[in-house]
Amino acid sequence: MIKYLRIGHGLFSALVAVLFFYQGWLGLKIRRARRSRASIPLAAVKRHRKRGPVLVSLGGLGFLFGLILVIIETGKILFYPLHLFIGLTIVVLLIGTFLISRRIKRPDSPYRTPHFILGIFILLLYVFQSFLGMGILF
């Protein structure tokens, strides 16, 4: 049973990571249009704004599910310390990015660049976390 839950956690987290890469692509598309003073792709803006909070929630759920799974399987929280630390870092950055995004109110907002930089870090950490997770699974 635990074996299937581990695979389920991996698949869920991989799906969330793919959705975050799509979210990042939307954000980059919006940013490029804004910086080149081209017309803003309003459909992309709407999708990016609407999906952001959902993805933050899914990222948090993936972390929580993984944490519970490790506790059930091993009885220890720190059994996979690097995977735990990277997952926790992702969650903290997700929350930070979400909170920063709430402060973006105008086109020249100083919060756009920190939002962008945190998003890049999140994506890089998801890649690293995925490799760590595959090492744990296999």
What are these regions (language model features)?
Residues M1-F138:
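Membrane-embedded alpha-helical bundles that constitute the cytochrome b-like, heme-associated redox core
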